Amino acid sequence: LKDISSKDLRKIIVDAKNRKRLRTKLSTLEVDKGSPLKGKILIQMFEKPSSRTRISFYLAIKQLGGGTLTLRSNELHLGQGGESITDTAKVLSTYGDGFMLRTDSEKKMEDFKKYLSIPIINGLSPLSHPTQVLSDIFTVEEIKKKPISKLNICWIGDSNNVLNSLIAASVKFSFKLRIGCPKKFE
C-alpha cells in the first residue's frame, strides 16, 4: 500500500464498486464490457498455499478480459541452484504484463520488486497482506454504505501481516484504527 497514493487507492475501490454493479447481470466467467485487460497476462507465483487468493485473482483477470499463468516456485529453477531472482524476474517480465507473488519471504518480495520491469502485486508476504485489506475496506464500505474514513475500525487479534497492512491503510484512507493484541501474540 505504501507505493500507491491515497488518491489511486480510492480509485481502485471506486472502480471495484462500479465493476461489481455493472456485473450484476453477467455470469462469473463473462468478460466485462470493453475487456480492459484484453491481451494482458498476469503471472501468479504461489509459494504458500492459497484458495481464495488464487481463485479471486484468476476470476478477476478473466472477467477483465485477460489471462493468468500460475506458477509454483518449485516448478522453476529459482532457488534450486539454477536461476537467481534477477534472472527469473527478467524472464517473467518478458512473458507477462504483471506479476503477483504470494510468498513467505519479505526479501524475495523486495528482490522481485527491484528486478521486475512489470508491476508487482503483493498477494501475501510475512509483513503485509494488502490485497486482503483492500477487499476488507471494499466490504466494510459496501455494508456500512459510507467511506471508511467516516468509521472507527477496531482490530482484536494477533499482530500479523494483515494488521500491518490495516495500519498502512488507516493512514492512506484516513480512518481511525484501534488495536488490541494479547501480549503473547504481539
Name each model feature, range by range.
Residues I4-K7, L37, K48, R52, ...:
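Conserved active-site and cofactor/substrate-binding residues in soluble primary-metabolism enzymes
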Residues N74-L76, L124-S128, P182-F185:
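Short, acidic/turn-prone active-site loops that include or flank metal/cofactor-
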Residues L26, A89-K90, G96-A169:
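Anion-binding alpha/beta catalytic cores of soluble intermediary-metabolism enzymes, centered on
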Residues E47-A60, E142-E186:
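Glycine-rich phosphate/diphosphate-binding loop of Rossmann-like nucleotide-binding domains
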Residues K38-I41, V91-D97, S149, S174-L177:
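Short, surface-exposed connector motifs at secondary-structure boundaries
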Residues T68-T70, F99, I120, L177:
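Hydrophobic beta-strand scaffold residues
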Residues L1-I55:
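Positively charged, low-complexity intrinsically disordered leader regions
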Residues I41-Y95:
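Active-site cofactor/substrate anionic-group-binding motifs, chiefly glycine-
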